[in-house]
Amino acid sequence: MPAIEVIQGDVTQLEVDAVANAANTELRHGGGVAAAIARAACPELDSESRERAPIGLGEAVETTAGDMPARWVIHAATMELGGPTSAEIIERATESTLAVAERLGARSLALVAFGTGVGGFPVAEAARLMVGAVRSFPLRSVERVVFAVRGDDAERAFSDAAAEAP
């Protein structure tokens, strides 16, 4: 099982192999974390995203990370464009992100709180689902998972989920 860390921080500045992006199925990065990642990465991220879109709910694909310290951005579809999300989608998107990270040979991965911004999903439930998915997924190459969240409530929710016995 990988080491799990929880931090309040800017996911675009983390020195990890891969950064996860909570995306829509069209891979349009218009708001929230997706927009911040698109701004920090490079123009190639948008063109690579357009080439790979659309993807299904819960699926994940990678692009280059451009000017960010990470090597890859893994875009996980947590909702339709502008639509809500669900527990099943968040869990599937987390598992898909982990599978892509493994395929890429990433040793470290930064995850954001899937579905809790534009998707409107409760942070504590997202934390429980995502930490549970990390613990149960058969990881081989990924040794470190960092949950990069915004705000005290999110940090507390993810820290509590990570502290629970597996």
Describe the predicted segments one by one:
Residues 1-104:
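Glycine-/small-residue-enriched capping loops at alpha/beta junctions
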